[in-house]
């Protein structure tokens, strides 16, 4: 199954030519299962969703700017169900999750100076962060009698964080002569790893 918002498509013809706004989201779901036998069955599922927001201003003269914001999730999962007997069955699950957040902006300014020269300033920035998870889980359900129900299992999650990756660029020039062209990078752009165990 899939769906997408369409408010942006309806609003687009009514926006001014020099100013644009755009927002939409979508998500996609897919599921499939396979029966190997009366005791064994495999379930596969996948999900992808994204939100997008953008602005743009361009008056076809000396000033342009815009920004974008995107965030979304991707999840893939496989689960194997096995029945040992009428009292005991298990579920073994392997899943992957990816989340990404991104914000970017730009501007382009142009000015005419008094000495018949043109000053141009350009700026852009990009910010990203995200997380990846690998999850391994096994769960057992045991019914020794109609009056008792026992659940037990174990799990492991491998986390990989990508925090605060930031890049900014600034450039200035007069006519064709550049006197500033600088790129800044954030200091905290290394990945962080973590392990989580449960039982």
Which residues does each PLM region occupy?
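Periplasmic-side early beta-strands and strand-to-turn transitions of outer-membrane beta-barrels
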Residues: 1-71, 101, 105
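Face-selective signature of the C-terminal outer-membrane beta-barrel domain
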Residues: 33-51, 70-199
């Amino acid at each position: 199954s899939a769906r997408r918002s369409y408010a942006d498509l309806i609003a687009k013809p009514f926006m001014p030519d020099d100013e644009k706004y755009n927002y939409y989201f979508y998500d996609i779901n897919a599921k499939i299962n396979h029966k190997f036998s009366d005791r064994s069955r495999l379930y596969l599922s996948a999900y992808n969703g994204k939100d997008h927001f953008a602005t743009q201003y361009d008056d076809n003269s000396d000033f342009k700017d815009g920004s974008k914001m995107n965030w979304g999730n991707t999840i893939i999962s496989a689960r194997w169900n096995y029945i040992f007997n009428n009292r005991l069955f298990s579920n073994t699950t392997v899943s992957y999750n990816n989340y990404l957040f991104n914000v970017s902006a730009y501007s382009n300014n142009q000015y005419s100076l008094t000495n018949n020269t043109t000053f141009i300033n350009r700026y852009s920035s990009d910010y990203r962060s995200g997380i990846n998870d690998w999850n391994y889980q096994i769960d057992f359900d045991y019914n020794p009698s109609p009056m008792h129900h026992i659940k037990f299992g174990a799990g492991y999650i491998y986390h990989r964080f990508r925090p605060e990756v930031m890049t900014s660029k600034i450039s200035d020039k007069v006519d064709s002569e550049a006197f500033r062209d600088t790129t800044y990078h954030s200091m905290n752009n290394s990945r962080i790893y973590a392990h989580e165990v449960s039982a």
